Structures are given as C-alpha cells and as structure tokens.
C-alpha cells in the first residue's frame, strides 16, 4: 500500500504512541523523517532517534519518547504543509508557535531546521510542522 504523506504518517504515529504512553515508536526510514527526528531530539522533545535494521532488509527509525510527570513532552504535533496544499514562507513570514514557546520545523535550501535558526540564517522554506 502506498502512502501519500509519509511525514504526516510519522507525526500521527508519534502522537498516537505518546497519547497511550508507549516508551518508543517505529516507522519506515527516510532521510527527511530522520532529519525531523534529529531536530526533535536536539530541541529536547524526545530522548533518542536511531536507525535500526527492520524486516526484509528495510531500515526503520525508532524514537524514544520523553515524558514529564507522566505526561508526554510533545503536546502539539501538527502537520502544516501537506501534499495537497504546500505552505511556503519567506524569512520574514516564518511562523512562531505559541508565541515562541513551541517550534516550527522548516525545510530550507540549507536543510531541515527550526524557525529561529532559519531566521538567523536568513532563509525561508516549506513549513513542515508545528511542535509544542
């Protein structure tokens, strides 16, 4: 079965696993998904993200979720730009999430980064998702 939006699938898997209290979650490997997972790790929303060898020689990404006082650290994980409607922003229009308390993950010409780093670098790009 083909997947129309693999990034949305990844975000939904993370949301579902966090809402039921699972310690980790796995999904099929792609470089974009790995970059998003590493951004989440760097920003402190998850403990770890690693590539593991899955079944039939296909790689998977495993994320170890982070909880604080029994509640998931990731409260909001929302896909913004999707396959049917892409959302692009210049460096001046990059959105702030919850007044700067959350992050937006941006795909730029310099790689996948958070909104504040994109502003510092002076680049815009496709707004992939919001995290808070």
UniProtKB/Swiss-Prot annotation:
Which domain of life does the UniProt lineage start with?
A: Bacteria
**One Gene Ontology cellular component annotation?**
ribosome
Please provide the record's keywords in A-Z order: Ribonucleoprotein, Ribosomal protein, RNA-binding, rRNA-binding
Report if keyword Hydrolase is assigned.
Answer: no
What molecular functions are annotated in GO for this chain?
rRNA binding; structural constituent of ribosome
Check the record and name the Pfam families matching this protein.
Answer: Ribosomal_S8 (PF00410)
Output one GO BP term. Answer: translation
Q: Known HAMAP family for this protein?
A: Ribosomal_uS8_B
- Record-linked PANTHER family: 40S RIBOSOMAL PROTEIN S15A
Known role: One of the primary rRNA binding proteins, it binds directly to 16S rRNA central domain where it helps coordinate assembly of the platform of the 30S subunit.
Family in the record:
Belongs to the universal ribosomal protein uS8 family.
**Assembly information from the UniProt record:** Part of the 30S ribosomal subunit. Contacts proteins S5 and S12.
Descriptive protein name: Small ribosomal subunit protein uS8
């Amino acid at each position: 079965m083909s997947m129309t939006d693999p990034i949305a699938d990844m975000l939904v898997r993370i949301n579902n696993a966090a809402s039921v209290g699972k310690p980790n979650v796995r999904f099929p490997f792609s470089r974009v998904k790995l970059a998003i997972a590493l951004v989440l790790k760097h920003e402190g929303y998850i403990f770890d993200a690693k590539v593991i060898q899955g079944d039939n020689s296909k790689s998977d990404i495993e994320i170890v979720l982070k909880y604080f006082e029994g509640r998931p650290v990731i409260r909001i994980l929302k896909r913004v730009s999707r396959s049917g409607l892409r959302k692009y922003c210049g460096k001046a229009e990059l959105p702030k999430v919850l007044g700067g308390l959350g992050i937006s993950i941006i795909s730029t010409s310099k790689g996948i980064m958070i909104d504040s780093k994109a502003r510092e670098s002076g680049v815009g790009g496709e707004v992939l998702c919001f995290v808070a």
